[in-house]
């Protein structure tokens, strides 16, 4: 698990590492198994599917444009430590956006759902993060580089559609605003998967980075929730 930390007065995260001194570092760092958050400031948290994309964003100056942000990646499917960290951050900062960005393919979407609702293997771990919102990549947003689905992708699409978490009954009342948001989130996932299968294409987020479209794309998505760069 890695986290990109911006060390300034606006967005940073400090850990007390048991017997070690607290740390503040401006680059990506490994988060240990045992820690205590002693200070955290951020306007939003952006969760990346891929480490390579996080590294590209840092190198392209994302943290200079958004010094009040925190970037996290579990390098694919989230391990429990990553999910516990995000849950702990939410305990300190429950009113900021927690956002996910990954591939527009069945694996990227399944990873998002795993963050939000876990899986059959983690049902008793109390680590679901239903407050995380999907901001991309959604190939319906713009003209993106794409490739055809493989037979394995098509099988994965069907697995996602058949997943219990898609149709699971929320413990939150469907009549509540939060319950309705969860229903909308699940429907959004269903719509994306069906769109993917109907059009037989997927989009790798790294293709945006190669074409220098990644930061502008994220800028456009963040602007929808009124998160804007400083330059």
Sequence positions of predicted segments:
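Nucleic-acid enzyme cleavage-core boundary/entry regions
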Residues: 1-99, 106-231
């Amino acid at each position: 698990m890695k986290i990109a930390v911006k060390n300034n007065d606006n967005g940073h995260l400090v850990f007390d590492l048991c017997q070690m001194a607290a740390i503040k570092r401006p680059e990506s760092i490994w988060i240990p198994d045992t820690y205590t958050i002693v200070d955290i400031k951020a306007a939003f948290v952006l969760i990346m599917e891929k480490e390579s994309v996080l590294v590209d964003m840092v190198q392209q100056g994302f943290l200079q444009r958004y010094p009040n942000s925190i970037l996290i990646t579990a390098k694919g499917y989230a391990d429990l430590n990553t999910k516990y960290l995000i849950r702990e951050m939410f305990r300190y900062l429950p009113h900021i956006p927690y956002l996910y960005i990954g591939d527009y393919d069945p694996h990227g979407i399944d990873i998002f759902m795993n963050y939000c609702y876990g899986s059959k293997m983690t049902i008793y771990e109390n680590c679901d993060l239903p407050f995380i919102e999907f901001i991309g990549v959604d190939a319906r947003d713009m003209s993106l580089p794409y490739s055809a689905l493989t037979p394995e992708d098509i099988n994965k699409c069907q697995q996602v559609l058949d997943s219990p978490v898609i149709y699971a009954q929320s413990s939150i009342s469907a009549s509540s605003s939060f319950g309705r948001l969860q229903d909308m989130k699940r429907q959004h996932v269903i719509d994306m998967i069906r769109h993917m299968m109907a059009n037989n294409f997927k989009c790798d987020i790294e293709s945006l980075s190669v074409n220098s479209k990644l930061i502008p794309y994220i800028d456009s998505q963040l602007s929808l929730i009124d998160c804007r760069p400083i330059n």
